[in-house]
């Protein structure tokens, strides 16, 4: 199953434009995540448990990378843990312009009452503001 999953993910990432992937991936991965049910790993972003995370990567998909529930990658989980454990980000009033927003953070950041949150990107359908930051 994992080798087949890696080939499927590699094919989709190489041949489907990113803007389309971003619109439907949150509908597909929870179903694919059923194959990863278990208690081996926990995603700190969404709290879901899996036997392991799904593979992810364009050229050589790396195993144990993508959370099927919230779509957090390793870097997203690390950033979440840093913000939660080393900063007052979730409690302190702030304004945040999030350029190239990650789906795993969008709803969570929007729900923070102390955060004035705006997303921006040139092509992403996830962004509220279409912006080129060159």
Tell what function each PLM region has.
Residues 2-134:
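Conserved N-terminal segment of class I S-adenosyl-L-methionine
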């Amino acid at each position: 199953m994992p080798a087949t999953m890696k080939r499927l993910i590699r094919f989709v990432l190489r041949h489907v434009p990113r803007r389309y992937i971003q619109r439907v991936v949150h509908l597909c991965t929870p179903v694919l995540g059923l194959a990863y049910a278990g208690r081996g790993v926990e995603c700190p972003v969404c709290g879901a448990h899996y036997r392991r995370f799904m593979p992810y990567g364009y050229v050589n998909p790396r195993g144990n990378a993508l959370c099927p529930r919230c779509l957090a990658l390793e870097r997203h989980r690390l950033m979440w843990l840093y913000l939660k454990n080393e900063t007052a980000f979730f409690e302190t009033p702030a304004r945040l312009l999030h350029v190239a927003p990650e789906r795993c953070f969008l709803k969570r950041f929007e729900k923070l009452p102390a955060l004035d949150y705006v997303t921006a990107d040139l092509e992403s359908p996830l962004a509220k503001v279409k912006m080129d930051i060159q």
